[in-house]
């Protein structure tokens, strides 16, 4: 009987581990260095800043970061190239790969950079026509990109959204009126600005805090944190067009192991010496997979995590 119970426990542990391995995969990279990813890392405070990342087919990954600002390409964990494109690091993350081109906007000198994704050829530079104000937010979009400027006093400001195409030509400007006079550093203000920066979809999911990542197989995909008095998890939600969750995949955690499976997200927005945030672009949907960029100070590694949507959808259990 004891042997039977022991065997059953072993098989259960194996099936859970296999199920997680079938859903979640990791790649690890050095922080900076000849074979690593260029970034800005403050080891004493365990702060790691990236200027962006993107994914192409066949496990080809593109990263931007560091000082000087570089674009780095990997095939899996094999480095393909690293190319310096600017001496000045970014304070925001605005980076994408579309068709055969890599695009990066440096918010510090208001310049759009474009180069071939092979790393070969010239780097085109376009100075943006946005005036003297520095953008406080920005994001790449499916076509073009948007920068947001703060106008007025920091605590109760209005904003202006400026839209550009992928050639760096100004398309339109839109005033964002702070009708409710919300504070600039509040969650309400963030929601207002995010509505101009990132696509969204309806979701009815109490106790969930996350972001819309795109569509897959007829479902709207959301990624974020779920938490109530009985449970805490990283959660992948599959929702229908009405926002109802049809399926969810949970990676349960306790406070001491929150980043065991899903790594600590990289920082993207360097607002001031004491304020750092992570834009939703640290996590992106590509094809059949969700990719999440993070790091481990203990391991001294940048970690790219991939969640296979089909296997997560078909899974009958959580990852932990």
Question: Which stretches of residues belong to each language-model region?
Answer:
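Repeated scaffold domains used in trafficking and secretory/extracellular systems
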Residues: 36-53, 89-99, 130-142, 177-188, ...
